Amino acid sequence: MPSNSTDLPAPGETRQMFVDGPAGRLETLLAAPRQGAPAGICLVCHPHPLYGGAMSNKVVYALASSALQAGLLTARFNFRGVGQSEGVYDQTRGETGDALAVYAWLRRQLPQAPLVLAGFSFGAYVSLKAAAEARPALQISVSIPFGKYLENAEPPPHPGCPWLALHSADDEVVNYDDTLAVLQAYVPPPQLVRFEGAGHFYHGRLSELQQTLLPFLQQHLPA
């Protein structure tokens, strides 16, 4: 599909496209809710590019599916160097630019739509960094890795909107207590949902994850 197509997907349709990013084209999947005009837009960021992260990740898919169910147009995309996206890994700096490029494209299509920024693991950190410029209506962070891959990195600013954080107490990749300490330092802290026994990848718990996300979206988005 041509880069920067201005055609949004029809209701119930999923469409592949390419958005021009800072380092080249970014492979993007747009999905539209089945009924009516979108109530908003949701941009979902995937896990670490150097450890197999991609927009096909099942937690990323679960985030996007929850947003679709809430009536949002959803966008998943591959960071630079992943899948058909151009460029090379850039330690969250370039990836934040990638997220903002997709956000800017979405904003041009739907200038007034409320924005939900969401991400899993590395993608949760990148989406929180992007919030300073994108100014979302809602922020969702799943297993956000403060300091895990990001040595000497300062936590990003508070997104300035209702914020939901989800984390498993037995996360084998991103330590729960370390993340909790950082989250509790924010003013106000995010709403935190602690999972038990879900690990980092929420194996067998994705439906529970979605059941947690959907009420948050429905509560805070305009009817």
Model-derived features with residue positions:
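Active-site nucleophile loop of the alpha/beta-hydrolase fold
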Residues: 47-48, 141-149, 168
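Alpha/beta-hydrolase active-site loop
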Residues: 89-109
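Short alpha-helix in the alpha/beta-hydrolase fold that links the catalytic acid
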Residues: 175-184
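Short beta-strand/loop motif that positions the catalytic acidic residue
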Residues: 158-160, 165-167, 171
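Short, surface-exposed "cap/lid" segments of acyl-processing enzymes
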Residues: 35-76
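Catalytic histidine-centered segment of alpha/beta-hydrolase-like enzymes
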Residues: 198-207
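N-terminal cap/lid segment of alpha/beta-hydrolase-fold proteins
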Residues: 1-37
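Gly/Ala-rich beta-loop-alpha elbow adjacent to hydrolase catalytic centers
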Residues: 118-127
